[in-house]
């Protein structure tokens, strides 16, 4: 009897070892197959005191500092040659961009000048009260200018453009609900907006994804019930939307009006945070944040990458407790 138990245990251990080795091999092959992709970029203040903006190599899982400035809420340009972000430090407050070739920083517009702009459209000014989390969110390149959420609750999407040395501003969308993320399709001036949907009956909030034309009242709900903590993403051609509805990650096809299952991510005292597609839309990078005990600290970040065609998944990194991330893009 004892020998039988030992034999069964040995077989089970052997099966588990083989399964683990298989998963490692599949993950290695998947990461090896990711070619011609820009690096992941993120801004962070590490527990050890180091801070700034970094680029992350998926294949060797190493990171390199590219700026001493923390580019909060950062995002790539369409050609991946620059990133735009919010600088929220004593030495500068406002929008800035970073050249991804030589890593030079160029201020775009200061908070002081932004406040002058928003006065023209009757939005409340934002005051700088020291380094921390900015109230200027999700800056992006759009046409020959820039867009962003204005204010803590991110209800207004603004578009600014400099012409003859003067900044012009236009409100593209303004609602009563907090905005999570947005995408703009230039040709049709179409807005894809992830926002909150309050459920009065159970007093919780979930997200919805809507589509509308700027300056028109033609709002359509594309996806109902998304996770309120995670951010949607779209590929460069804006034909699909990737989103998380616990515990599953889906890809919604705008052309067929159907959703496809990609993978599952079960959360235990965690939140799904960033979802970022590769430039070709084949791979999905996402982050899961461990919730600190009694919210005594920041999320402990975990990096994952999944093949949207096969569902194969790799855990790239588990960062240290106390590392605070301010923005990620791929």
Please provide the spans of the model-predicted regions.
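N-terminal Lys/Arg-rich, disordered targeting/topogenic segments
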Residues: 1-3
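Sequence signature of WD/YWTD-type beta-propeller architectures
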Residues: 6-15, 19-330
């Amino acid at each position: 009897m004892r020998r039988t138990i030992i034999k069964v245990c040995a077989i089970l251990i052997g099966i588990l070892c083989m399964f683990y080795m298989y998963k490692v091999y599949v993950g290695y092959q998947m990461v090896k197959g990711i070619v011609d992709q820009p690096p992941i970029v993120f801004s962070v203040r590490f527990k050890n005191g180091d801070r700034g903006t970094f680029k992350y190599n998926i294949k060797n899982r190493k990171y390199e500092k590219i700026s001493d400035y923390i580019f909060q809420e950062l995002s790539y340009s369409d050609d991946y040659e620059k990133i735009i972000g919010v600088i929220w430090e004593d030495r500068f407050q406002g929008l800035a961009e970073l050249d991804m070739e030589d890593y030079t920083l160029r201020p775009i517009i200061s908070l002081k000048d932004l406040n002058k702009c928003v006065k023209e459209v009757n939005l409340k000014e934002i005051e700088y009260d020291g380094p921390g989390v900015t109230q200027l969110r999700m800056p992006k390149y759009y046409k020959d200018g820039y867009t962003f959420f204005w204010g803590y609750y991110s209800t207004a999407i603004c578009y600014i453009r400099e012409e003859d040395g003067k900044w012009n501003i236009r409100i593209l969308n303004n609602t009563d609900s907090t905005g999570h993320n947005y995408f703009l399709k230039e040709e049709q001036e179409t807005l894809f907006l992830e926002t909150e949907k309050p459920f009065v009956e159970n007093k919780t909030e979930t997200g919805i994804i809507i589509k509308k034309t700027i300056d028109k009242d033609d709002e359509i709900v594309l996806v109902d019930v998304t996770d309120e903590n995670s951010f949607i993403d779209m590929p460069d051609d804006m034909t699909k939307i990737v989103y998380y509805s616990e515990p599953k990650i889906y890809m919604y096809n705008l052309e067929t009006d159907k959703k496809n299952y990609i993978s599952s991510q079960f959360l235990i005292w965690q939140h799904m945070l960033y979802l970022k597609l590769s430039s070709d839309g084949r791979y999905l990078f996402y982050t899961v944040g461990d919730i600190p005990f009694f919210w005594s600290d920041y999320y402990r970040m975990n990096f994952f990458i999944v093949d949207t065609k096969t569902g194969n998944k790799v855990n790239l990194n588990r960062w240290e407790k106390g590392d605070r991330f301010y923005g990620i893009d791929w």
